[in-house]
């Protein structure tokens, strides 16, 4: 049973929503974040990356940096940039990219569900990345970056979402990257009750994106439980901000690979090794964008090759059978020497939103070989999570990204 509850939201005043809404904090490096905040001073990135308010030489993890995030947020509330909605309710958040809309239910998910495995994960997290968000949430006393969750389709939830969207939205704007964002507030008490009950029927929800944010929110909750052992079970810190989407609405883009060198091999040797695993077509003039599972594009020596996995090569396993796993375990590791893609500096990952031309550009600039992938499917992701297994790094690329700063959950 999934506990997905309504909450009291701090949200932008309607006239400031488009200015405040920001891409996730980890999309930017330090220099990019500072540049973005300088050109968009009301962007939530100023709060999400508070070091942007300090000199470049400042320690971005110093206590005063996190305190600045808290002060700036409270000042924006005081100035009217944000409004505090006292009503506990759900919101709908629709994002439309390339004429494809997806609508999530904005809510608070249970920390206990995360701990007990009702909320299923498919990625490892790195402790050093968690620490920054733990401090940010704890000092802010609020969560601002929603966790992107998925659930298997529920007919009644689809009906309720469609009904609620007949009302006028609170926000309706197009961000600089061309994504349309619309938000509705659920006003009906009966609808709130029914949404909650429908989620309670679900055996599981799934983290699609935001594993580090989720882990950080949970660790803050566990810390506060230790500090406040008499706090009620429904204390706000026992829940974390999330947006839940029916998995059949979601688009997964591929995560492509680029490698720094050929590990001492010639191009001819690499093609020979590839032919042991794949049916190789090429050289080709046109870039290869894989159209089916088991197809990989390889850019080598300024030209493309179309690789199609041979029968019997793919292991019958939810993780080892993923295209990204087959490429890693049977080619990148033994042939190109990429033993651990999490730590090896010779490999980089390029989100599918940037297109295959970016792979050509990287190879012309500093890399020697690139691989365009067919995207992991939602069914593959759910199967891995249901089995309690973890995917290799950079297996999925979800677009569009949820904006931070539109919904704030105070702890």
Describe the residue ranges of each PLM region.
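Surface-exposed, charge/polar-rich loops and edge strands
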Residues: 1-411
